[in-house]
């Protein structure tokens, strides 16, 4: 029995993305303008912030931009060069575009359904661009931008998101660009209405009392000790690991298994985790659009066929969107037959 033969069910899959996911999405085919995706260690070099940083005391400047920014924001929050840096960062990320070929983000969008959620800490527009260009092909997952995003706008009055700086089709609703939550040491996730809403939804999906989430995938997010508030909010929703014996925690990361399991030790129930170094080794790529069904076949099978269900790995070498959409279409068709 192949997983694609199972009847679609409704359990939620939560995917949480960090910078490593966006980097992975542009390895095979780089960003269309040749722009480099910066990390917190090289962001001043890539974006060109040293002219601004030179206006601050040398003792505030650290190797990691997150530490530098936190020091500056605490030392001199009203300094005009802080706003200049904010504007330069926003402008750089806003100019980035995915290549015009299927990327890992396109696979990710197509491998989930509208019952699922992708939450990202990234500022770059790649995830939203992938969602937008695949939106007409099957139901798509809900997107949550936990630190804001250059591509996403929000209308608070109507509680709707759309493309930043754009209007709805009837031009009655304007989507105000979301604010980027810059890397201060103590982030206030309640300070912005959109970011607060995104966190509320994520916490709801992680809470076993409010949602039937069986699969959580962490992709390229290092669980930094500096982001105490983020980890605290997720841990509060997840609860005690002793109570999460029916969930599977999956980590896609190039770090060692020992490193990543230690980082996420407060979320992993004993052996209930999978460690992968590539997206294509993950449940998302092995059981696209059917990861929840695969979970039940493996852990709570009703028949011998379910216990030995075969995977349906998505091909890794699509060169056109048409090829990719054609491959996913039988899975989408079966969903409409429920």
Where are these regions (language model features)?
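Short helix/loop capping segments that flank catalytic or ligand/cofactor-binding pockets
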Residues: 24-26, 127-130, 153-156, 226-227
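Secondary-structure boundary elements
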Residues: 110-117, 133-139, 209-212, 220
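Residues at the C-termini of beta-strands that transition into short coil/loop
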Residues: 122, 147-150, 253-255, 290
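Gly/serine-rich nucleotide phosphate-binding loop at the start of the catalytic core
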Residues: 1-127, 146, 327, 337
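SIR2/sirtuin-family catalytic core signature
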Residues: 1-17, 21-25, 204-338
